[in-house]
């Protein structure tokens, strides 16, 4: 009897283990299922080290700065936590097919968009350069979808951030060291991430080769996933059953049909004569009784036009001094914009101006032209830098002196230099149709194009880049 009891207990233990294995295999392998097993793989542990190191330092300094920078940092932190959850999922599950993979990546993608949108909604922020540095580089979180070279993609995003972090350094290096430390902490996130990818995910996110296939998101620790929609509606009723008939019925029907066809013209003898009182077109009473009868296809009718799309809300035009920043925004078809009474510590930010002309008198610290079209800018003296970004067909004229003009992501830019600004440095990137006009003794200008095409060669020790001369 004791042997029988021991045998039953052993069988119960075996069944329990089998049920546990079965439950683990059927688990819906999403973010939420991974939380309890975090840190079981080396690359999840390494990512945790990144979160505890540069990310924690970035969050700490952002909190000290406060305001928009702190809010932005919290959004970035959410994106990194979503990425960690995906890494845990990948360490336990096999990679799903295309559509299912998109579902898994959707929360990260939406969080990236939220970070970018925050910057666009706060263009008037005093910490706009901080927000821009984050917004331009947050796309680096998308490395999980990049193959076979996710590392270089992150580096490219890091380089994009440096365009704005350099501004932060220039503005705060002698004013507040906290902002300098913020730049170092933020950029170190992406440099550390590059090293992490190189070690664990060189050719793309490393998925498990065993375990269940990862499915759509469900059960995020913070609540329902951002990317999941409402449950699908219940399926409709099944189609009515197709009437069935026996083989003998089909055979009989076919035989009857062929018999009628073989009758030839004699088949018309079975037709009944239709008298005039039975014809609709000859019997008005019958026509009124039966209503409109249409034979043949419906006549062509033009499709209804789509409802007009709502017109985008037009932002109000601005020309105002906010603190130490002149804001010139959303000006259209205005040819006499003027900024006077400037001070050395003031800056000018010109955004989304179209077919307009602005003159800035006096000496100012810096000027930024962002997302403008057909803008004419005339200024006296700038002690820092004039930057033209994301613009098209811009003309800039220097009346006094400026040390540096930067042209970035711009198509069509004419720079008219004065005699006092001939030593100006012109830095360009990702731009085209740039021309510098040099004054002559007669008061005219000679036009010189800025090179756009380059040739790079390996000389045995390093890459050597030269301007490509095109004979015309």
Curated annotation (Swiss-Prot):
Modified residues (Phosphotyrosine): 31
Pro residues compositional bias, start-end: 229-243
Region (Disordered): 216-253, 290-312
UniProt cross-link Glycyl lysine isopeptide (Lys-Gly) (interchain with G-Cter in SUMO1), position: 345
Gene Ontology BP annotations: actin filament organization; cAMP-mediated signaling; cell morphogenesis
Subcellular location, record wording: Cell membrane
Claim: Cell membrane is one of the keywords in the record: yes
Residues with the Phosphoserine modification: 34, 290, 295, 301
InterPro entries listed in its UniProt record: Adenylate_cyclase-assoc_CAP (IPR001837), Adenylate_cyclase-assoc_CAP_C (IPR013912), Adenylate_cyclase-assoc_CAP_N (IPR013992), C-CAP_CF_C-like (IPR017901), CAP/MinC_C (IPR016098), CAP_C_sf (IPR036223), CAP_CS_C (IPR028417), CAP_CS_N (IPR018106)
Domain of life: Eukaryota
One Gene Ontology MF term: actin binding
Entries under Gene3D superfamilies matching the protein: 2.160.20.70, Adenylate cyclase-associated CAP, N-terminal domain
Biased composition (Low complexity): 218-228, 244-253
General function of this protein: Directly regulates filament dynamics and has been implicated in a number of complex developmental and morphological processes, including mRNA localization and the establishment of cell polarity.
Record family assignment: Belongs to the CAP family.
Assembly information from the UniProt record: Homodimer. Binds actin monomers.
Protein name: Adenylyl cyclase-associated protein 1
UniProt source species: Bos taurus
Gene (UniProt): CAP1
């Amino acid at each position: 009897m004791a042997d029988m009891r021991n045998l039953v207990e052993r069988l119960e233990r075996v069944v329990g283990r089998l049920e546990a294995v079965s439950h683990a295999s059927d688990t819906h392998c999403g973010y939420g299922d991974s939380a309890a097993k975090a840190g079981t793989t080396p690359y999840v542990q390494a990512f945790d080290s990144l979160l505890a190191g540069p990310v924690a330092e970035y969050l700490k300094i952002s909190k000290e700065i406060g305001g928009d920078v702190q809010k932005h940092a919290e959004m970035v932190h959410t994106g990194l936590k979503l990425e960690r959850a995906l890494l845990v999922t990948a360490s336990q599950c096999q990679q799903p097919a295309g559509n299912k993979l998109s579902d898994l990546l959707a929360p990260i993608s939406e969080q990236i968009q939220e970070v970018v949108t925050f910057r666009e909604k706060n263009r008037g922020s005093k910490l706009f350069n901080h927000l821009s540095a984050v917004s331009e580089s947050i796309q680096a979180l998308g490395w999980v979808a990049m193959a076979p070279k996710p590392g270089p993609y992150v580096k490219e995003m890091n380089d994009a951030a440096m365009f704005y972090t350099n501004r932060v350094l220039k503005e705060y290096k002698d004013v507040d060291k906290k902002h300098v430390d913020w730049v170092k902490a933020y950029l170190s996130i992406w440099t550390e991430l590059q090293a992490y990818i190189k070690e664990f995910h060189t050719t793309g996110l490393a998925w498990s080769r065993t375990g269940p296939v990862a499915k759509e998101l469900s059960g995020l620790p913070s609540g329902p996933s951002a990317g999941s929609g409402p449950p699908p509606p219940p399926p409709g009723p099944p189609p009515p059953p197709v009437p069935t008939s026996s083989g003998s019925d089909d055979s009989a029907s076919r035989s009857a049909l062929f018999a009628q066809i073989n009758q030839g013209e004699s088949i018309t003898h079975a037709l009944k004569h239709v008298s005039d009182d039975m014809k609709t077109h000859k019997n008005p009473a019958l026509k009124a009784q039966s209503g409109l009868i249409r034979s043949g296809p419906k006549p062509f009718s033009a499709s209804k036009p789509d409802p007009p799309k709502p017109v985008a809300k037009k932002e109000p035009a601005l020309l105002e001094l906010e603190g130490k920043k002149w804001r010139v925004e959303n000006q259209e078809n205005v040819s006499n914009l003027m900024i006077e009474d400037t001070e050395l510590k003031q800056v000018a930010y010109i955004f989304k101006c179209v077919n307009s002309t602005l003159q800035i008198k006096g000496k100012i610290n810096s000027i930024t032209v962002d997302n403008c079209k057909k803008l004419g800018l005339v200024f006296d003296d700038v002690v820092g830098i004039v930057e033209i970004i994301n613009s098209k067909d811009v003309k800039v004229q220097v009346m006094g002196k400026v040390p540096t003009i930067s042209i970035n992501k711009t198509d069509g830019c004419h720079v008219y230099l004065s005699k006092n600004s001939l030593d100006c440095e012109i830095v360009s990137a990702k731009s085209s149709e740039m021309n510098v006009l040099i004054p002559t003794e007669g008061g005219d200008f000679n036009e010189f194009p800025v090179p756009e095409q380059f040739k790079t060669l390996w000389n045995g020790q390093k890459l050597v880049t030269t301007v490509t001369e095109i004979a015309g």
